[in-house]
C-alpha cells in the first residue's frame, strides 16, 4: 500500500488546486509574486529627505498598483513573434510635509499616473494548458505543460532553481589551527519592507580568549559576545556559564569556564565596571570612527534596534538568549565539527524559485528607482533651489531591463539562472525547472566549497542518478526526486501561521517555556520565542507534529526539528524555499498506515489531499532539516522485520525506491539492475532524445527537432505516466537482435534495416529559424545580373513559400550598391550581392515567412525538413546502450526467423556483458510478453509497470511473462515456453537459408533517437568558401567553413613526418609525453633514486641491468604501475633483431635486363 500512497501524490489533485504535480510549486511561486507580493513591494510610503530635525520631510508614495494580463494567448504571441508579458502600472506622488503648530501641512511637488503601456512589462509564466495566474480562463492545451516564459521574438525560456547564498545555520570555519569563525546572517521577515540584511561574524582565537568578539562591517560594534549577551539578556556571567555548560562534553565545559573567566578579567580590569557604560563607550567610539551625520542617540538606536533584523520586534532579553544559544553551537562545533551541518549541506540553504527571482529583482530595482528620485531632487535643489523631479526619472523604474537580463540568464550579475528552452526534448520542460544549482561564481570565489560530491543531505530529496557526468556543472546541479517540492507561502499566511504557533507555545505553563538557563530554545525561522523544559521536549514535538497533520495550524508543510546531540534546540521553519516531501508516519513504534484498515479499501476513490484530511496521521510533509535530524526507516519491508523495541526508535518511514528518482531517471528502466554509471549516462541520453511535436510547431519560428511517428512506451513507471512524458512519447518500438553481423557492428556500431527507415522508422522533422536584417535601401535595390542564389526569391525579394532551399540559396534580397567616382565610365553604378545564404547540407522546405518593416527589413523564415536515419546518427535504449549507425542493410541481407521477420536493428551482443545492462533484457522480455497479452483480465489495455528503481526480483518479472504466454497459448511445451519467455529464437542465414547454430536474443524494445545528427556536425570538406584576405577556409559551419590545414600544419608533416605527427596528436598533449627507462633483463620500469635510474629487481640480485630509454604516454606508465601493485606482472619486452648496419649489403647486378 505504500507504493499506492506514493502514486497518489504524483497524480493531479484538483481539490487542492494541483493540476500538474511536477511543476506545481513553480506555478504557485510565480502566482504568489504577481498576484500578491508585487503589490506589497510597489506599495510604498516613506520619507526621501528630511530637514530641520525632521520637521520638514520630502515624502514619496506609490499606490494604485495594477497588473493587467495580455489580451492574447501564448500561441498568438508566438505567431506575432512577440513576448508574452503582463503590464504593471502605478501612481507616484512626491510631496513635502512640514510640521507646524497647527499640524502637518502638505505641499505637492510632483506626481505621475503611470498608464504607459511599457512602464513595467513582467514576463508572464505560462502554466499547464497555456494558462497564466492572471487569466485562468485561457483554453487548455493538454500536451502543453508550460513552465516557460516567451521572450521577445517568441524565444521560450526556462529556468533552474538557485541555492541561496545566505544560510539558515551559521557557517563554521577553521581559519588556522586554534582559530575559528562562526558567521551568520540575519534577514528581516517578509512583512518588513524594504528587506534588511545584516551579516555577523563571531571570532575565537584560543590564545586570546578575551577577543571572543562579534562584529559586523559598519553596522555593529566589535564587542565581546559574552558581555553583549549579558548586556542584552540582563543576566549574570554565572548564569551564562551554567547555560553554556549544560549538557556539554567535558572538553567543551573546560573551554566555557576559560571563556567566562576571560570575560571576568575584562570586567575586573575596568574600575567600577558597568555593562551599560561599557557598551555606550563602544558605540560612541564607533560613531566617531564612522563619522556619522546622525546624533549619538540616533546612531545608538539605529545600531541596537536593527541588531538581528529577523528578531526586529523581539525584546532585547530574547536577543541575548539567542546569542547564548549561538555561542553554544559554536563551542560545541570546535570539538565536534562533523556533527554540525556544514555550509554545503542543503539543511542550511533555501532555494530560489521563479517567484523569488522576480521578487528579489523587483525589490532591488524599486530601491534603485527611489534612490534615483532622491538624487534628482537633491541635484535640482542644489542647482536651482527647487524641489523638483524630472519626468524621465519618474517614468523609468528600471524593472524591464532587470527582467530582460534575468531571462537572458543573468540573475543579479550571476549566470546560470535561465536558459533557452531546447525544442527537441519534451522532457526538458520538466527537468530544467525541477533542477537545483549553486551559483557558479559562488563556487569559483569560495575555496572551501566541496559541493562537487554527492552530499549526504541530498539523499531522498534529490535524484542520485540525474547529475551532470562531466563539465563545470558536475556536482553543482541536482534534480529533485519525484516526491520533492519547494515550499511557498504568502506574507499574510506567514503572519497568521507565526501567530498561531506562538499562541500554541504560550498555551504551555509559563515556567515550562521560560527555561532560559538549561532549556531547549524554541525558534521560529531562527527567531527565539521561548525555552522549553528539557523534560517536555519529546511530548512537545510529538504533540506539535500531530496538530500540524490535523491542520491545527492551517499549513501542512511546517517543519519542526528536534536538534539533540548537545546543541539542544527546537527549530520551527515556516518560510518559503524549503525542500519538502511526504513520509509515512511512525508513532510509538507503529506504522500508522497499518493502523487504518479502511484506508486500503477507500484509496482508489481518494486524492492525496483527501488522505491528508481523512487520515491525517498516515502521511506527513517533512522538510529536509526535519528529515536530517529524525530517525527514518528506508522501507516498509525493513520496518516490519524489526522488533517492537527497534521500531520505537523511528519517527518516519520512506516510500519505495522508485520515488527517490527524478522524472528523467523515471523514464529509464530498472537502473538498480545495471551498473552505476549506466544510470547517470542514461539520464543524460534520455534528455537528448527527440520527442514528439509540440502543439503549435508551425506557429513558432524557432529551432526544433521533432519525432514524426512517436509511440507511447509499453514498459513505463507511474512517474512517467503521471508527468505525461509517456503520453507525449520520446521514441518508437523496434525489433532488435543481439548478435554480430559480419564484423560491422563492433563497439557502438549498429545495423539498421533499410525498409524500416523507408517506412518512417524513427523519422524526424527539423524546424529551423533563419533570421536576417537588411538595410531598407539594399532590400529595394534590383539585381543587375541574374544570380543563381536568387532563384528561389519572388519579385518582392522574399523567399517563396514551399520552396526547397539548397546550400547557397539566398533567404532575402540584399544588394549593396556604390557609385564610382570615374568620369570616363559609362555606368559608374556598381552593385554586388551581400545576402546571407542557406548553409545547411540538406534541402529544406520553406514553411513560413515573416517580415517587419522599420528602419531595417527584418526577415524571419521557418524551414522544415524530414530527416531519415543515415550513417553516423546516434540512437540509444533507455538503459544507456548508445549506438551509432554503422551500416544500413537491405532486408534481403538480414537474418530472419521462422515467420520471416527480420530485425529492425542489430546490436552488438557483447555490449550487454561489458556495460552490465541486465534491465535492457528485462525490458525486451516484458515488451514481448505485453504483445502476447496486451489486455488485463477486465479487457482493458494496460502498460507494464517496470519502475526505474525497484525492489522486485527478476524472477517475478519472468513469472509475469510466463503467465502472459500461458494465457495466450496454454499448449506450449516447456522448451517453447522458455524460448518465448527469454526471447530466444532460431534465425536463418539470408545467404544459405540455414539456421544459425545458436539461438539469438530477438524481441521488441523502446528505442530513442538522439539529437546528435551527422549532417548537423559535419565540418570537414576539401573544397568550399575561403576568406578574401588570406584565402584560407572560413571558420564555423554556419559560414560554410571547414578545418583549415595551413602552413604550420604542412611544415609539421614535412619536417616531422606524417607518422610521427599522428603519434604526437594521439598522445594528446605535451604533458602526456614521458620518457621511461626499462630494464632489458626483467622488463621492469626503472626507479629513480637520488637522481640515478636503477632497476630494483636486478639490483637486489646483484645483476648489472641494461637500461633502455623509451618514450610513452604517462597513462601507460600509470597503468603498468597499478597492475604491478595488484600483483599482475606486465613485462616490457624488446624485439631482438640485428642492427641494419651490421647486415651484409645485398648484391646489385648492373647487367642490362635484355642480357639476363
Swiss-Prot record:
Coiled coil: none annotated. GO terms for molecular function: DNA binding; DNA-directed RNA polymerase activity; metal ion binding; ribonucleoside binding. Its EC number is 2.7.7.6. InterPro entries: DNA-dir_RNA_pol_su2, DNA-dir_RNAP_su2_dom, DNA-dir_RNAP_su2_hyb_sf, RNA_pol_132_poxvirus, RNA_pol_bsu_CS, RNA_pol_Rpb2_3, RNA_pol_Rpb2_5, RNA_pol_Rpb2_7. It is an enzyme of class 2 (transferase). It comes from the Viruses. Keywords: DNA-directed RNA polymerase, Metal-binding, Nucleotidyltransferase, Transcription, Transferase, Virion. Disulfide bonds: none annotated. Its main location: virion. Pfam families: RNA_pol_Rpb2_3, RNA_pol_Rpb2_5, RNA_pol_Rpb2_6, RNA_pol_Rpb2_7, rpo132. Transmembrane segments: none annotated. It is found in: Virion. One of its GO terms (cellular component) is virion component. GO terms for biological process: DNA-templated transcription. It catalyses: RNA(n) + a ribonucleoside 5'-triphosphate = RNA(n+1) + diphosphate. The DNA-dependent RNA polymerase used for intermediate and late genes expression consists of eight subunits 147 kDa, 133 kDa, 35 kDa, 30 kDa, 22 kDa, 19 kDa, 18 kDa and 7 kDa totalling more than 500 kDa in mass. The same holoenzyme, with the addition of the transcription-specificity factor RAP94, is used for early gene expression. Belongs to the RNA polymerase beta chain family. Part of the DNA-dependent RNA polymerase which catalyzes the transcription of viral DNA into RNA using the four ribonucleoside triphosphates as substrates. Responsible for the transcription of early, intermediate and late genes. DNA-dependent RNA polymerase associates with the early transcription factor (ETF), itself composed of D6 and A7, thereby allowing the early genes transcription. Late transcription, and probably also intermediate transcription, require newly synthesized RNA polymerase. This is DNA-directed RNA polymerase 133 kDa polypeptide.
Amino acid at each position: 500500500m505504500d507504493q499506492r500512497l506514493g502514486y497518489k501524490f504524483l497524480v493531479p489533485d484538483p481539490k487542492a488546486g494541483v493540476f500538474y504535480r511536477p511543476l506545481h510549486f513553480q506555478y504557485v511561486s510565480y502566482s504568489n509574486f504577481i498576484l500578491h507580493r508585487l503589490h506589497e513591494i510597489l506599495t510604498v510610503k516613506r520619507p526621501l529627505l528630511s530637514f530641520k530635525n525632521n520637521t520638514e520631510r520630502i515624502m514619496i508614495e506609490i499606490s494604485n498598483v495594477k497588473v493587467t494580463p495580455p489580451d492574447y494567448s501564448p500561441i498568438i504571441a508566438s505567431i506575432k513573434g512577440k513576448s508574452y508579458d503582463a503590464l504593471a502600472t502605478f501612481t507616484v506622488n512626491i510631496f513635502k510635509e512640514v510640521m507646524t503648530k497647527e499640524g502637518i501641512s502638505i505641499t505637492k511637488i510632483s506626481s505621475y499616473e503611470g498608464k504607459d503601456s511599457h512602464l513595467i512589462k513582467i514576463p508572464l509564466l505560462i502554466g499547464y494548458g497555456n494558462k497564466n495566474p492572471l487569466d485562468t480562463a485561457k483554453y487548455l492545451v493538454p500536451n502543453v505543460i508550460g513552465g516557460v516564459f516567451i521572450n521577445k521574438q517568441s524565444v521560450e525560456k526556462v529556468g533552474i532553481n538557485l541555492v541561496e547564498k545566505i544560510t539558515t545555520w551559521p557557517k563554521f570555519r577553521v581559519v588556522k589551527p586554534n582559530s575559528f569563525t562562526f558567521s551568520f546572517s540575519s534577514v528581516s521577515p517578509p512583512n518588513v519592507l524594504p528587506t534588511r540584511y545584516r551579516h555577523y561574524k563571531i571570532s575565537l582565537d584560543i590564545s586570546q580568549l578575551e577577543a571572543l568578539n562579534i562584529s559586523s562591517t559598519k553596522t555593529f560594534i566589535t564587542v565581546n559576545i559574552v558581555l553583549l549577551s549579558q548586556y542584552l539578556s540582563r543576566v549574570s556571567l554565572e548564569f551564562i556559564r551554567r547555560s553554556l555548560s549544560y549538557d556539554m562534553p567535558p572538553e567543551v565545559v573546560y573551554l566555557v569556564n576559560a571563556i567566562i573567566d576571560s570575560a571576568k578579567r575584562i570586567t575586573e580590569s575596568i574600575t567600577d565596571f558597568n555593562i551599560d557604560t561599557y557598551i555606550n563607550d563602544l558605540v560612541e567610539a564607533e560613531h566617531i570612527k564612522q563619522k556619522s551625520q546622525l546624533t549619538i542617540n540616533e546612531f545608538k538606536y539605529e545600531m541596537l534596534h536593527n541588531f538581528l533584523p529577523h528578531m526586529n520586534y523581539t525584546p532585547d532579553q530574547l536577543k541575548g538568549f539567542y546569542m547564548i544559544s549561538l555561542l553554544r553551537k559554536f563551542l560545541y562545533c570546535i570539538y565536534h565539527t562533523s556533527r554540525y551541518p556544514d555550509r554545503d549541506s542543503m539543511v542550511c540553504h533555501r532555494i530560489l524559485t521563479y517567484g523569488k527571482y522576480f521578487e528579489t529583482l523587483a525589490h532591488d530595482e524599486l530601491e534603485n528607482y527611489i534612490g534615483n528620485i532622491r538624487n534628482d531632487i537633491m541635484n535640482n535643489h542644489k542647482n536651482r533651489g527647487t524641489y523638483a523631479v524630472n519626468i524621465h526619472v519618474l517614468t523609468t523604474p528600471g524593472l524591464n531591463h532587470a527582467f530582460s537580463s534575468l531571462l537572458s540568464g543573468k540573475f543579479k550579475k550571476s549566470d546560470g539562472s535561465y536558459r533557452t528552452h531546447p525544442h527537441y526534448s519534451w522532457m526538458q520542460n520538466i527537468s530544467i525547472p525541477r533542477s537545483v544549482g549553486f551559483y557558479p561564481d559562488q563556487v569559483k570565489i569560495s575555496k572551501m566549497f566541496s559541493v562537487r560530491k554527492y552530499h549526504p543531505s541530498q539523499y531522498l530529496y534529490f535524484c542520485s542518478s540525474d547529475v551532470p557526468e562531466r563539465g563545470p556543472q558536475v556536482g553543482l546541479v541536482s534534480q529533485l526526486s519525484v516526491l520533492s517540492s519547494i515550499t511557498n507561502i504568502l506574507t499574510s499566511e506567514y503572519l497568521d501561521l507565526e501567530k498561531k504557533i506562538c499562541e500554541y507555545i504560550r498555551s504551555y505553563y509559563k515556567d515550562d517555556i521560560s527555561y532560559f538557563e538549561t532549556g531547549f530554545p524554541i525558534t521560529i525561522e531562527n527567531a527565539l520565542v521561548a525555552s522549553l523544559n528539557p523534560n517536555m521536549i519529546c511530548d512537545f514535538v510529538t504533540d506539535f507534529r500531530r496538530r500540524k497533520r490535523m491542520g491545527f495550524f492551517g499549513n501542512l508543510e511546517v517543519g519542526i526539528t528536534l536538534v539533540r546531540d548537545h546543541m539542544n534546540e527546537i527549530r520551527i521553519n515556516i518560510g518559503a524555499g524549503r525542500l519538502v516531501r511526504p513520509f509515512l508516519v511512525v508513532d510509538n513504534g507503529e506504522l500508522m498506515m497499518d493502523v487504518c484498515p479502511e484506508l486500503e479499501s477507500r484509496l482508489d476513490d481518494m486524492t492525496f489531499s483527501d488522505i491528508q484530511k481523512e487520515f491525517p496521521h498516515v502521511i506527513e510533509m517533512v522538510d529536509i532539516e526535519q528529515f536530517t535530524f529524525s530517525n527514518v526507516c528506508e522501507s516498509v519491508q525493513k520496518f516490519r522485520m524489526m522488533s517492537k523495541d527497534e521500531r520505537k526508535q523511528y519517527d518516519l518511514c520512506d516510500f519505495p525506491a522508485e520515488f527517490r528518482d527524478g522524472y528523467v531517471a523515471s523514464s529509464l528502466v530498472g537502473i538498480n539492475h545495471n551498473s552505476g554509471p549506466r544510470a547517470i549516462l542514461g539520464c543524460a541520453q534520455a534528455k537528448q532524445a527527440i520527442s514528439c511535436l509540440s502543439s503549435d510547431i508551425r506557429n513558432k519560428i524557432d529551432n526544433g527537432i521533432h519525432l514524426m511517428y512517436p509511440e507511447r512506451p509499453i514498459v513505463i513507471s507511474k512517474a512517467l505516466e503521471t508527468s505525461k512524458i509517456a503520453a507525449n512519447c520520446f521514441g518508437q518500438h523496434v525489433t532488435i537482435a543481439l548478435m554480430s553481423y559480419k564484423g560491422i557492428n563492433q563497439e557502438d556500431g549498429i545495423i539498421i534495416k533499410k525498409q524500416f527507415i523507408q517506412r518512417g522508422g524513427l523519422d524526424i522533422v527539423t524546424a529551423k529559424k533563419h533570421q536576417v536584417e537588411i538595410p531598407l535601401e539594399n532590400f529595394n535595390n534590383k539585381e543587375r545580373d541574374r544570380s543563381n542564389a536568387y532563384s528561389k526569391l519572388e519579385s518582392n525579394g522574399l523567399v517563396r513559400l514551399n520552396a526547397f532551399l539548397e546550400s547557397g540559396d539566398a533567404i532575402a534580397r540584399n544588394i549593396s550598391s556604390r557609385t564610382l567616382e570615374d568620369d570616363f565610365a559609362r555606368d559608374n553604378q556598381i552593385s554586388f550581392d551581400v545576402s546571407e545564404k542557406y548553409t545547411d547540407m540538406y534541402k529544406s522546405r520553406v514553411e513560413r515567412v515573416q517580415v517587419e518593416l522599420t528602419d531595417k527589413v527584418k526577415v524571419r523564415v521557418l524551414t522544415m525538413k524530414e530527416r531519415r536515419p543515415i550513417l553516423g546518427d546516434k540512437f540509444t535504449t533507455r538503459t544507456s546502450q548508445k549506438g551509432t549507425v554503422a551500416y544500413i542493410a537491405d532486408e534481403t541481407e538480414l537474418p530472419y526467423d521462422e515467420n520471416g521477420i527480420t530485425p529492425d536493428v542489430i546490436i552488438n551482443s557483447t555490449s550487454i556483458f561489458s556495460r552490465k545492462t541486465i534491465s535492457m533484457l528485462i525490458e525486451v522480455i516484458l515488451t514481448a510478453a505485453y504483445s502476447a497479452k496486451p489486455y488485463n483480465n477486465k479487457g482493458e489495455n494496460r502498460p507494464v509497470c517496470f519502475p526505474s528503481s525497484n525492489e522486485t526480483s527478476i524472477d517475478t518479472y519472468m513469472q509475469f511473462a510466463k503467465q502472459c504466454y500461458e494465457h495466450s497459448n496454454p499448449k506450449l511445451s516447456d522448451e517453447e515456453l522458455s524460448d518465448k519467455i527469454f526471447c530466444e529464437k532460431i534465425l536463418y542465414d539470408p545467404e544459405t537459408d540455414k539456421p544459425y547454430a545458436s539461438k539469438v536474443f530477438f524481441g521488441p524494445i523502446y528505442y530513442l533517437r538522439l539529437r546528435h545528427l551527422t549532417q548537423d556536425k559535419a565540418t570537414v570538406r576539401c573544397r568550399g568558401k575561403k576568406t578574401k584576405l588570406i584565402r584560407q577556409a572560413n571558420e564555423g559551419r554556419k559560414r560554410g567553413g571547414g578545418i583549415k590545414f595551413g602552413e604550420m600544419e604542412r611544415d609539421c608533416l614535412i619536417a616531422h613526418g606524417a607518422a610521427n605527427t599522428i603519434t604526437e596528436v594521439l598522445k594528446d598533449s605535451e604533458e602526456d609525453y614521458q620518457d621511461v627507462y626499462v630494464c632489458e633483463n626483467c622488463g621492469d620500469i626503472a626507479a629513480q633514486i637520488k637522481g640515478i635510474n636503477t632497476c630494483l629487481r636486478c639490483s637486489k640480485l646483484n645483476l648489472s641491468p641494461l637500461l633502455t630509454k623509451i618514450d610513452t604516454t604517462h597513462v601507460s606508465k600509470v597503468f603498468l604501475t597499478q597492475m604491478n601493485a595488484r600483483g599482475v606482472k606486465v613485462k616490457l619486452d624488446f624485439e631482438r633483431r640485428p642492427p641494419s648496419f651490421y647486415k651484409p649489403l645485398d648484391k646489385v647486378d648492373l647487367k642490362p635486363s635484355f642480357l639476363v
